[in-house]
Every structure is written in structure tokens, then in C-alpha cells.
């Protein structure tokens, strides 16, 4: 079954049966940003097509973890990006967040695998995005590995920002 549209949040021309857990996680994350659908419903709709329990678990970890730690991830990404994360296309933002979550918080996934899989996923979106962002994604994720994290904001001077970045709590 080939999917020729972008409305379903999948790369054009991908076979639903061959979607990787990362691709499905990205699809759910993008849908979560673009619709008012409940996250549990989005996961249930897409995760049921995954036959392996291990892959379903990875999808859920990637989705929930990326959303839970988004404040921290965005802070780390902004430190290695030349321009602010929010100025990039939404798909590229989510690809970077997905890759960064794996690098920063999942110690069972080798860094090289996290970078490589995210770059391959980025390439699959090149046609939809009008350009190939894989070079930027590769460079940013590799910089995340190389460049030490900047110090957290001072809790005495910036208590809300400090808590937000340390624990992934959005500032209200």
C-alpha cells in the first residue's frame, strides 16, 4: 500500500508494512503537533500495525520520552544550532528532537545508530520538504555528542527556566 500524500504524516511513497518504529514515532509526534487528537488515540491507531512487542515499546518510549523531555531537548538543540530550532520546518524540528532524545536519554541505543537512523528518516522526507535536510540533522546530532551541555540556568536568578530545562516542565 503506497501512500502518496503528506496528510498521513508519512514520507511519500512509503510502504506502511515497512515503517520503522522511529518512522511511526515521528508520524505520531507530527500528528500530535498538528491535530487536537488525544495522544493515546494517535498511538493506538498507528502502533497496532507493529507486529513486534519490542518495536511497539520503542515507539511508545520515543513518543512519550520526546514529549516529556522536550524542554530539555530544545535547550540542548538550541545550543548547537546556528539558528533557533523553532525557525526550522516542523518535520525537521521533530526529527532533531527524536534523534536528540535517543542520544541524551536512551543509553541502550548506540549513538551511531541513533544518528544514522534519524538521518535516514530525514532523507525519506526530502521530497516533501523540498530539500534534503539530512546534512543539517547529521551535523547537529553529531555536535550534540561532541559538545558538552551548557550549564543550566541559575536557579536563584531564573527558577522557572531552570526547573523547566532540568526536568522538562513547560513554563506556564
Predicted regions and their residues:
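Class I Rossmann-like S-adenosyl-L-methionine
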Residues: 2-172
Amino acid at each position: 500500500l503506497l501512500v502518496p500524500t503528506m496528510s498521513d504524516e508519512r514520507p511519500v511513497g512509503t510502504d506502511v508494512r515497512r515503517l520503522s518504529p522511529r518512522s511511526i514515532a515521528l508520524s505520531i509526534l507530527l500528528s500530535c503537533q498538528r491535530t487536537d487528537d488525544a495522544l493515546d488515540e494517535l498511538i493506538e491507531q498507528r502502533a497496532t500495525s507493529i507486529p513486534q512487542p519490542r518495536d511497539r515499546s520503542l515507539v511508545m518510549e520515543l513518543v512519550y520520552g520526546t514529549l516529556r523531555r522536550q524542554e530539555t531537548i530544545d535547550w540542548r538543540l538550541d545550543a548547537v544550532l546556528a539558528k533557533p530550532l523553532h525557525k526550522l520546518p516542523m518535520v525537521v524540528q521533530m526529527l532533531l528532537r527524536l534523534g536528540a532524545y535517543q542520544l541524551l536519554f536512551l543509553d541502550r541505543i548506540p549513538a551511531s545508530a541513533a544518528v544514522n537512523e534519524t538521518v535516514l528518516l530525514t532523507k525519506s522526507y526530502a521530497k516533501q520538504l523540498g530539500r534534503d535536510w539530512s546534512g543539517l540533522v547529521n551535523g547537529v546530532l553529531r555536535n550534540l555528542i561532541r559538545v558538552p551541555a551548557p550549564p543550566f540556568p541559575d536557579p536563584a536568578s531564573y527558577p522557572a527556566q531552570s526547573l523547566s530545562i532540568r526536568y522538562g516542565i513547560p513554563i506556564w
